């Protein structure tokens, strides 16, 4: 249970500074504050890399995070100043040496193009790098059964809990870190706290969709910028519409745009970016899967 994880490490970071975390004698994690997001680096020693390489080359369960080698992290960017736990609402992030990556919020998988991840295999172990842009953080309760119109504002205290699962010795071993709470300067996170998504929807229209979103301004200052609508056609991603946005202080604004789908045998997704007057992304939505009207995947 998340609420049973006790705080043992509290660290204040400036931009460019890192907090090291030891999961066990084979596993080290480094949390680094960047000016636009949080970076997590794993360094995993492994004496049986031959087994690891073969497993993720040929095993049919190589995508399964509950088998093989797995890095696991619970993360809450919404922890209070006195938080002693990785508390609701939390993310769960998992990865393995096959470069399979999983990210869930409120226990629901929500891929986001802005979140970056990579894996490096070495002779004596493997490494993982994750980057979570502040602009990509989830800001509303998107679950269909939710009865609350809740928005989540990222805070200055981020709580982490790390664990590693390994079976290269022939038996499953799971080790975990203490809870780590990282405090970041308010001026770093504030530009990404002003504009929140309060909703995000897609509706079919012919061979395309209408994408709509509700924006909320949490600040006593007006926000002026743009919303960019991105279409993913397979691996190709491009801006298909742009709208000017003027959010009054503590006010709301709705945007919508039709998105036409090209006749291609690919999977489609759409995501939105809110950018300020300097064209800096301050809010990036999760990827919205769109049904292909020509091909059934």
Residue ranges and their predicted role:
Residues 1-8:
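Sec-dependent signal peptide recognition
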Residues 9-234, 242-297:
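Structural preference for beta-rich elements and adjacent junctions enriched in aromatics
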């Amino acid at each position: 249970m998340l609420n049973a994880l006790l705080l043992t490490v509290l660290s204040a970071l400036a931009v460019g500074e890192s907090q090291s975390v030891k999961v066990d004698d084979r596993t080290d994690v480094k949390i680094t504050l960047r000016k636009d997001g949080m970076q997590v680096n794993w360094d995993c020693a492994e004496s049986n890399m031959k087994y690891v390489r073969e497993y993720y080359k040929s095993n049919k369960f190589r995508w399964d995070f509950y088998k093989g080698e797995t890095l696991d992290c619970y993360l809450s960017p919404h922890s209070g100043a006195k938080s002693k736990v990785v508390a609701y609402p939390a993310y769960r992030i998992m990865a393995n040496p096959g470069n399979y990556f999983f990210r869930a919020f409120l226990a629901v998988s929500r891929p986001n193009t802005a979140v970056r991840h990579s894996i490096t295999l070495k002779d004596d172990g493997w490494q993982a790098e994750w980057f979570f842009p502040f602009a990509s953080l989830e800001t509303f309760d998107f679950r269909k059964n939710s009865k609350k119109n809740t928005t989540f504002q990222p805070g200055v205290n981020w709580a982490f809990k790390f664990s590693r699962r390994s079976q290269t010795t022939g038996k499953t071993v799971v080790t975990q870190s203490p809870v780590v709470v990282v405090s970041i300067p308010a001026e770093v996170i504030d530009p990404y706290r002003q504009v929140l998504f309060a909703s995000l929807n897609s509706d079919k229209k012919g061979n395309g969709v209408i994408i709509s979103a509700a924006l909320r301004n949490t600040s006593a200052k007006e926000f002026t910028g743009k919303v960019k609508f991105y279409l993913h056609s397979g691996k190709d991603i491009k801006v298909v519409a742009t709208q000017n946005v003027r959010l009054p202080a503590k006010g709301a604004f709705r945007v919508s745009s039709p998105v036409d789908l090209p006749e291609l045998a690919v999977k489609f997704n759409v995501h939105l970016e809110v950018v300020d007057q300097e064209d800096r992304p301050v809010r990036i939505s999760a990827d919205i899967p769109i049904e292909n009207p020509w091909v059934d995947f």
